[in-house]
């Protein structure tokens, strides 16, 4: 027991590692219900003294398992509009590579300066998420009465649904998905909310289909970013300068996977307001810590 209490990993004691695991489980559940689980785990890591870039990289890599679990849960909806994936996944892929490369190659001081702004942007999106989701739902309902032949209708067969979705994928949608990929590869948090807003406006699909595509795109951005992190960390950086904390990655992966499985059960019993309040509180904590580090050094 004493040996367990004295155990350390990356300079973090057993108690702090257990806290990371709990935060990762909570993040997995949050992602299942309202998204933005990164704003749970990232502040916890930063508050423990983990450098911001290492916290972002390790967190993003650890959450990948939960991302693909969420996408698998929407596999039926994704298959219905699979015709859009051939153009949207490459856009997310390229954006994720660029965002991840910027994160891991620019001086850490740049991220330390930019991250507080991105946290504020993420918190604004989290706060606005209910109104955005309600607007997207209203738009989906209005589309059912829309005479525009490109709009999905309840009576459409599978081939028609796929064709209408594919026809709606123009350069504006591809460009915005690409930019969302850069944001996701660089900071991770709230990219799902951003994608839902984009696709709610431009993609001819139901709300559930758009949510399925969103889950898959987020998973690909995070996977692409993770591969980029590893390549840059091991091919460019010196061993003493590497930022990936593999122990933290493993703990978050286990926790977020467990959280993803229990999220649906817990999420139906907890108010989204409560979950969102926790995200905002932890996001403000991270903002305070980073501003203090920025001002004090």
How should each PLM-predicted stretch be described?
Residues 2-51, 140-211, 218, 250:
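Selected transmembrane alpha-helices and immediately adjacent juxtamembrane segments
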Residues 98-104, 177-187, 225-234, 286-297:
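Hydrophobic alpha-helical transmembrane segments in multi-pass integral membrane proteins
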């Amino acid at each position: 027991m004493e040996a367990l209490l004295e155990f350390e990993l990356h300079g973090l004691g057993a108690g702090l590692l257990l806290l990371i695991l709990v935060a990762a489980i909570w993040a997995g559940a949050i992602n299942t219900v309202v998204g933005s689980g990164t704003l749970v785990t990232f502040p916890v890591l930063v508050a423990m003294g983990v450098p911001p870039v290492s916290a972002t990289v390790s967190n993003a890599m650890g959450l990948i398992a939960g991302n693909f679990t969420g996408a698998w849960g929407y596999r039926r909806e994704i298959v219905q509009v699979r015709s859009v994936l051939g153009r949207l996944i490459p856009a997310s892929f390229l954006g994720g590579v660029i965002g991840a490369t910027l994160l891991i190659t620019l001086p850490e001081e740049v991220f330390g300066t930019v991250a507080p702004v991105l946290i504020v942007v993420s918190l604004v999106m989290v706060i606005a998420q209910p109104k955005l989701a309600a607007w997207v739902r209203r738009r989906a309902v209005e589309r059912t009465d829309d005479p525009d032949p490109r709009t999905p209708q309840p009576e459409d067969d599978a081939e028609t649904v796929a064709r209408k979705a594919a026809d709606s994928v123009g350069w504006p949608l591809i460009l915005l998905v690409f930019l969302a990929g850069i944001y996701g590869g660089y900071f991770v948090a709230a990219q799902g909310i951003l994608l839902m807003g984009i696709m709610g406006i431009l993609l001819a699909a139901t709300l559930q289909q758009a949510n399925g595509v969103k889950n898959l795109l987020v998973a690909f951005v995070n996977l692409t970013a993770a591969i980029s992190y590893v390549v840059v960390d091991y091919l460019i950086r010196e061993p003493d300068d590497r930022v990936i904390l593999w122990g933290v990655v493993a703990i978050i992966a286990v926790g977020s996977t467990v959280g993803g499985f229990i999220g649906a059960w817990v999420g139906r019993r907890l108010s989204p307001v409560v979950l969102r309040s926790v995200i905002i509180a932890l996001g403000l904590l991270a903002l305070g810590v980073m501003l203090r580090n920025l001002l004090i050094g």
